Amino acid sequence: MELNGPPSSQVPHTPTCAPSLPITVAGTLLRGPQLLLRAAEKYPRTPKCARCRNHGVVSALKGHKRYCRWKDCMCAKCTLIAERQRVMAAQVALRRQQAQEENEARELQLLYGTAEGLALAAANGILPPRPAYEVFGSLCGEGGTDSKIQKFDLFPKSLIPRSMTPQLPSGGKPGSPDSEPVSGSAPGASSPEAQPGSGSENGDGESLLSSPISKELKEGEESPSLISPLSSESGSDAEKDEQDPSSSSLARQRTPINILTRVFPAQKRSVLELVLQGCGGDVVQAIEQILNNRSQDKGEGTWSKDGALQSIQPSVSSTHRPLIAGALTPAIGTIGSRSAFSPLQPNAAHFGTEANTYQLGGHIGLNPLRLAYSAHSRGLAFMAPYSTAGFMPTLGFRPPMDYAFSDLMRDRANVHKDQVYTNGLYGPVVNNNAEKQ
């Protein structure tokens, strides 16, 4: 069989492409480079400037905030963006603070345990304070009615506001016969009726009547003359106002002169008024002055107005004690009787007076050193706290204005120095000059 065509060996091979064969191209050749692809993927997710977006411009936010064209724009959209940014910044700061506090609280719990760690965190301000039943629920749940009953006895009623304390009935007074069994009970325990229902109004009222402050008020209403100085001074005005609704009568009794008359019923009212005036209206200071006078011996002599303050000649008496802070002490010659804390004192002969003399009249026989450095600056002017017992009742002193230092020097200048300093205090030079005159 013959073939009509040339042999295959003689047919020239021409490079022809078969149309049925598919062409395969690698996918990496159709994509861009790896660097360009990464930039193309992340650029749409980079933060953009919101102000520029409001005005139709797209700009990356990194390094753009300072150079933004619309950073000071006050339009409605930009103002809303600024407010939203402020709120978001506050929320982020709060979340950071809460996360830090939680981490610190977690560390404290690991160190000290759960309850102690939360307590320390709340005490240091790391955690906001929670109610007691959340942290110490087991401790608070153990307390029963006994702790509630003791609550009314341990804490005074003056610490509880007036709105929380129940008002007493109008007919029942602290001094009425109905309240006598209650007041007769012990101060530290409430009445038997108040124990079963400690939270009721009856328990509050009876425990209020059984407090020591109300008992003092009841005794004060029955016998005001038998009140001691301690009981009259104890209890502030606020506590008495809380206990007794009739504050007008107590206000009249709390005046300084009334307090002094109740504390010292044996003293005259005029004397107490004068002492109070000299102390500048200070009740405590006036009581100290009177108590210091009463602590001396009752047998000592009293000073009269003419003999003590206005005598020109020196009056010698060994029974009197110094009324002036600048006066000399009695046993000045004996070293053993002097105190180690007493200041150095010159000889009494330089002043022409004895150790216990008082010249408060025309020329005043005072020690200038002791007068200048007075040890007692409170109370009456130049008055020592160790005055005689009869000094106050006899009114043996001048008004406080006469004790000014300028008046003392003025009275002293009216008298010649030879009458006061008989032994030549300032040496022969001054005395010779005086003799020449």
UniProtKB/Swiss-Prot annotation:
GO molecular function: DNA-binding transcription factor activity, RNA polymerase II-specific; metal ion binding; RNA polymerase II cis-regulatory region sequence-specific DNA binding
Stretches assigned to the DMA domain: 254-289
UniProt-annotated location(s): Nucleus
Keyword line: DNA-binding, Metal-binding, Nucleus, Zinc
Location of region: Disordered: 160-253
Pfam families linked: DM, DMA, DMRT5_DMB
Main location class: nucleus
Transmembrane regions listed in the UniProt entry: none
Segment forming the signal sequence: none
GO biological process, one term: regulation of transcription by RNA polymerase II
GO cellular component term, pick one: nucleus
Low complexity composition-biased segments: 179-201, 223-235
Key word Zinc present: yes
Family listed: Belongs to the DMRT family.
Name this protein carries in UniProt: Doublesex- and mab-3-related transcription factor A2
Species of provenance: Xenopus laevis (African clawed frog)
Protein's gene: dmrta2
